[in-house]
Design a protein with these regions (language model features):
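Aromatic-anchored helix/helix-loop segment that forms the rim or "lid"
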Residues: 183-201
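Catalytic alpha-helical scaffold of carbohydrate-active enzymes acting on polysaccharides/glycoconjugates
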Residues: 1-176, 180-181, 199-201
Length: 201
């Protein structure tokens, strides 16, 4: 089970962005706002204020080991959540520095963000992350992961049901594909699930 922790690193003018977030919220078809979008900010805040804690308590009660895909900026802003993650012994893979779309970000900027994410992870958890998942990656992301060379696995792929090796010259990278079919985000998208029964069938 993977718990994505992104709240606090999304597009928001408070983070220096030009527009509000539009991705993965309960506001279907949200349009970017050039300024503060109080409803969107509040929806994202739910994850750090209530969502994480509800799931964390459930996982602890049922003794379920999980992996947290943690966005560096979001983790840095929420030390109480980081403490809970450490105390629980969850694996934490890096989910990048920001929860933004890297499609049109320069490779040099994306590389800088990757370094920031790794440094922040080391500062918080005392070691570098073993896994990487940007989520909204670019055509450069896999190159940067392999150039870094320190990740046991990369999950920026949806291309298989099983892990596989990507080989480029003398370098190889374990790919553990991500899945959107087994993701609760499908409850928040218009092509997604309508009921819990749809999810389980």
């Amino acid at each position: 089970i993977v718990l994505n922790y992104e709240e606090g690193a999304e597009n928001c003018v408070l983070n220096g962005d030009k527009n509000s977030e539009i991705f993965l919220s309960e506001i279907i078809g949200a349009k970017p706002v050039k300024g503060r979008h109080m409803s969107m900010e509040s929806l994202y805040e739910y994850g750090s204020r209530a969502g994480f804690w509800r799931l964390h308590k459930l996982f602890q009660k049922k003794k379920i080991p999980i992996t947290v895909f943690g966005v560096g900026m979001a983790l840095e802003k929420n030390p109480e959540i980081c403490k809970a993650i450490k105390d629980a012994g969850y694996e934490v893979a890096s989910h990048g520095w920001r929860w933004i779309d890297y499609q049109n970000i320069k490779k040099s900027e994306e590389k800088k963000h990757m370094k920031l994410a790794i440094q922040t992870h080391k500062k918080i958890f005392g070691e570098r992350p073993n896994g990487w998942y940007t989520g909204r990656c670019s055509s450069n992301t896999r190159d940067l992961v392999m150039e870094d060379g320190g990740f046991l696995y990369d999950s920026d792929s949806y291309s298989d049901d099983l892990p596989y090796w990507e080989i480029r010259g003398k370098k190889k990278q374990l790919i553990i594909p991500y899945t959107l079919d087994n993701n609760d985000m499908r409850f928040a998208t218009n092509q997604g699930f309508n009921t819990g029964d749809h999810f389980f069938t």
